[in-house]
């Protein structure tokens, strides 16, 4: 009977934790009102998710932005609610809404492509019978927070190379360390985790390329790979080298990206949560304190 009673009135620890989209012209009063409304309807935790449509007056990770984050966290604490921090401005995660690359273009996403024309700046990986296999910047982007920064728009932020330890370190310094600096007294109590969302190695809006990073050629060679055989990737064929490539790529992503975030979260008293780039990337779930992708539905509030 106790079990049935808990099903009818579950403890707060079993609450749903929805994405709470932070956009528009946010105010302290409105944040407090919406959190109180969540609690009144049995929602005792939220993911603070900055989202497209954020006021241009609110700079991502800026002073006003963090003042609003503090308001939300303090209000949640007063309501005995839990907060999960979202580690990006929109998605995919890993670029701090373009800030990782802004002053460090060398940290932008890169990949390999098969081409008949080697361009200045290309790194020749192998010459094959179907063309040159070269490494170049992918030009991949992410969805931004402000109007004019969405997919296909000229100000869409560039994505960072999440296989590059230096890029991931910069992402953590810009994002995780900034949140900790601003609201560290709530880590491990009100704040229980960081949510990373579908990190993409190439970024969005990229075609004709496969992920790569500086130093990966040597990793591949030492594992017994022949780079010339990766030309098969571009016509959908498989061979021992394409299978080795995918295996090493996932290992690298796990160690450099997910592993770094997981260790940071553990060291700061919270857990890594999130959605891998591919929902069936089971191997990387070992880095998550709360494994498993998200469930997508919508909670709509009526304006008053």
Per-range role (PLM):
Residues 237-268:
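Active-site neighborhood of glycoside hydrolase catalytic domains
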Residues 84-89, 195-197, 257-280:
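Aromatic-lined carbohydrate-recognition surfaces of secreted/lumenal glycan-active proteins
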Residues 33-49:
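Catalytic domains of carbohydrate-active enzymes, especially glycoside hydrolases
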Residues 61, 93-117, 200-231, 285-293:
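Aromatic- and acidic-residue-enriched segments that line the glycan-binding/catalytic groove
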Residues 20, 76, 194, 265:
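Conserved, mostly hydrophobic/aromatic
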Residues 49-169, 173, 184:
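Acidic/aromatic-lined carbohydrate-recognition and catalytic surfaces
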């Amino acid at each position: 009977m106790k079990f049935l009673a808990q099903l009818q009135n579950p403890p707060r620890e079993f609450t749903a934790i929805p994405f709470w989209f932070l956009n528009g012209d946010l105010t302290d009063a409105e944040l407090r009102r919406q959190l109180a409304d969540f609690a009144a309807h049995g929602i005792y935790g939220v993911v603070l998710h900055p989202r497209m449509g954020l006021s241009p007056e609110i700079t991502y990770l800026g002073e006003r932005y963090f003042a609003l984050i503090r308001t939300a966290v303090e209000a949640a604490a007063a309501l005995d609610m839990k907060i999960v921090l979202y580690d990006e401005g929109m998605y995919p995660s890993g670029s701090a809404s373009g800030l990782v690359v802004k002053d460090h273009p060398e940290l932008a996403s890169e990949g390999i492509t098969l081409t008949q024309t080697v361009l200045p700046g290309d790194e020749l990986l192998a010459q094959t019978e179907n063309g040159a296999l070269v490494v170049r910047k992918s030009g991949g982007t992410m969805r931004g927070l402000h109007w004019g920064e969405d997919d296909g728009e000229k100000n869409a932020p560039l994505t960072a190379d999440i296989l590059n330890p230096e890029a991931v370190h910069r992402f953590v310094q810009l994002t995780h360390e900034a949140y900790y600096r601003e609201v560290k007294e709530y880590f491990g109590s009100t704040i229980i985790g960081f949510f990373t969302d579908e990190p993409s190695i190439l970024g969005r809006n990229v075609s004709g390329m496969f992920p790569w990073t500086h130093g990966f050629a040597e990793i591949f060679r030492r594992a017994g790979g022949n780079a010339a055989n990766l030309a098969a990737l571009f016509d959908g064929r498989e061979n021992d080298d394409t299978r080795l490539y995918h295996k090493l790529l996932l290992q690298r992503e796990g160690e450099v990206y997910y592993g770094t975030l997981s260790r940071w979260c553990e060291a700061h008293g919270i857990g890594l949560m999130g959605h891998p780039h591919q929902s069936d990337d089971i191997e990387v779930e070992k880095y998550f304190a709360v494994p498993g992708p998200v469930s997508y539905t919508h909670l709509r509030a009526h304006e008053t």
